[in-house]
């Protein structure tokens, strides 16, 4: 846990799907003693609720209502929605696609950003998503834009799906098409599009191991945030 007697620190990790944000952010948070915040999981939780309620993702008013009413709690490696553990339920292609669609709705984004800021203003965090360094915490102490080439991102995401469902419910070709569409939607949406913050460090993880990426980011944190802390 972060030491509340010291200045809280925000490490923002942005990037497209499949770049390795979640894996890296979890490991980094553990090493730093910070709280890990998966903002994408928050959007997924709202998308799951919408699917269960039969609410069309295009119904902006209803989606905004759901986002504002959703009781989302994040724990170590878990997420609950209205008191129910939905950690596994949100990790399906259908929910992932829905999350990307509702992520372009301004009212939904406002509700999620408010929840994310409230967490980050309480304690030190490693927060990953698509607009953390540009919108949620533009004054983050450390900003990383984590990327990988499209083929590698598809391969990683497909392997992730296969570990949960074998045979997977989607082919690798279908996943590639969905991810390409999502990349386009995320980078061209009018409200908080996926973009590298001007002061973010760009890191291509295509040919790097998890340990190598973690160490590279940890080195950046050490150089920018001393604050009497020992980031070993």
Curated annotation (Swiss-Prot):
One of its GO terms (biological process) is nucleobase-containing small molecule interconversion. Keywords: ATP-binding, Cytoplasm, Kinase, Nucleotide-binding, Transferase. It catalyses: CMP + ATP = CDP + ADP; dCMP + ATP = dCDP + ADP. It is found in: Cytoplasm. Residues 164-192 are annotated as: Disordered. SUPFAM superfamilies: P-loop containing nucleoside triphosphate hydrolases. Its EC number is 2.7.4.25. The keyword Kinase applies. Coiled coil: none annotated. It is an enzyme of class 2 (transferase). ATP binds at residues 15-23. Residues 178-189 have a biased composition (Basic and acidic residues). The keyword ATP-binding applies. GO terms for molecular function: ATP binding; CMP kinase activity; dCMP kinase activity. Pfam families: Cytidylate_kin. GO terms for cellular component: cytosol. It comes from the Bacteria. Signal peptide: none annotated. Belongs to the cytidylate kinase family. Type 1 subfamily. This is Cytidylate kinase. The gene is cmk.
């Amino acid at each position: 846990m972060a030491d509340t007697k010291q200045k809280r620190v925000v490490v923002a990790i942005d990037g497209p799907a499949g770049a390795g944000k979640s894996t890296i952010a979890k490991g980094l948070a553990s090493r730093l003693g910070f709280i890990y915040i998966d903002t994408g999981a928050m959007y997924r939780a709202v998308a799951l609720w919408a699917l269960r309620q039969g609410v069309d993702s295009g119904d902006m008013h209803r989606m905004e209502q759901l986002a504002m009413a959703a009781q989302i709690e994040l724990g170590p490696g878990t997420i609950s929605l209205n008191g129910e553990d939905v950690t596994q339920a949100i990790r399906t292609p259908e929910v992932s696609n829905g999350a990307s669609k509702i992520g372009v709705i301004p009212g939904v984004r406002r509700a999620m950003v408010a929840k994310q800021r409230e967490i980050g203003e309480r304690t030190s965090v490693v927060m990953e998503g698509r607009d953390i360094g540009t919108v949620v915490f533009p004054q983050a102490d450390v900003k990383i834009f984590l990327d990988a080439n499209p083929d590698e991102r598809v391969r990683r995401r497909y392997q992730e799906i296969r570990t949960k469902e074998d045979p997977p419910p989607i082919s690798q070709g279908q996943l590639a098409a969905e991810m390409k569409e999502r990349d386009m939607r995320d980078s061209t949406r009018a409200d908080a599009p996926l973009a590298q913050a001007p002061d973010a460090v760009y890191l291509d993880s295509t040919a790097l191991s998890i340990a190598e990426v973690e160490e590279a980011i940890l080195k950046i944190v050490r150089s920018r945030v001393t604050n009497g802390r020992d980031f070993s």
